[in-house]
């Protein structure tokens, strides 16, 4: 598996191209992502959104049309693609597939799991491909996603942290902002955040 990364826009939101067996999955195409994605993908299969915030989905519509590929988004965040609730001027897009909580999908023989971790947003997910976890704004290196936005939920975030702490397997985490880390390296940080939410 090959993973390309490019921070995008004012908030340096990480856009990823995850390539498995020659198949490209575009994860969180944010502000200005189109040119970079078009230059670095050869066999695009789908756009995968970890959640619906504008800086993660800004280029959804443009890329979907240019590449003729579908958009997969957690069902509870699809309204954000359509309505721009934070009023940032994000281009409207529509999910071709509204992903259920903890749903496993198979695309071109590649297994992808949308792990449900609400809190930062109602439908916030971490997308698993092999032993890699694209965590969006759920987990960062040494931190977690904010829970003071409209539609955020501190209580849901606590449940999500307890959920991920119950996992026995380790994963390489590719977050929505900042550098990669390992789940095993974030356990102490995650436990401490439970006291501050």
Regions found by a protein language model. Name each.
Residues 27-29, 45-52, 71-74, 115-119, ...:
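Active-site neighborhood of phospho(di)ester-bond hydrolases with catalytic His/Asp-centered motifs
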Residues 53, 77-78, 148, 179-181:
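Short histidine/acidic/glycine/proline-rich micro-motifs that form metal-
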Residues 169-197:
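Charged phosphate-binding loop/patch that engages nucleotide di/tri-phosphates or the phosphate backbone
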Residues 31-107, 188-192:
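Active-site HxH/HxHxD metal-binding segment of metal-dependent hydrolases
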Residues 5-7, 17, 47-52, 60, ...:
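Secondary-structure boundary/capping motif
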Residues 79, 126, 177:
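Divalent metal-binding pocket/active-site signature
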Residues 1-43, 92-166, 182-184, 194:
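Catalytic core of the metallo-beta-lactamase
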């Amino acid at each position: 598996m090959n993973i390309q990364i490019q921070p995008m826009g004012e908030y340096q939101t990480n856009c990823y191209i995850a390539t498995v067996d020659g198949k490209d999955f575009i994860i969180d195409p944010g502000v200005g992502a189109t040119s970079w994605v078009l230059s670095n993908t050869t066999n695009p299969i789908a756009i995968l959104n970890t959640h619906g915030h504008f800086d993660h989905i800004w280029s959804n519509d443009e890329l979907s049309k240019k590449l003729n590929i579908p958009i997969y988004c957690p069902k509870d965040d699809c309204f954000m693609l359509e309505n721009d609730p934070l009023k940032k001027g994000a281009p409207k897009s529509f999910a071709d597939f509204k992903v259920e909580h903890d749903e496993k999908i198979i695309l071109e023989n590649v297994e992808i799991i949308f792990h449900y971790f609400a809190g930062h947003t109602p439908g916030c997910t971490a997308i698993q491909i092999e032993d890699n976890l694209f965590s969006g704004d759920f987990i960062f290196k040494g931190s977690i996603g904010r829970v003071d936005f409209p539609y955020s939920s501190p209580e849901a975030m606590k449940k999500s942290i307890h959920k991920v702490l119950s996992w026995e397997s380790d994963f390489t985490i590719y977050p929505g902002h900042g550098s990669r880390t390992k789940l095993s390296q974030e356990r102490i940080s995650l436990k401490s955040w439970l006291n501050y939410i």
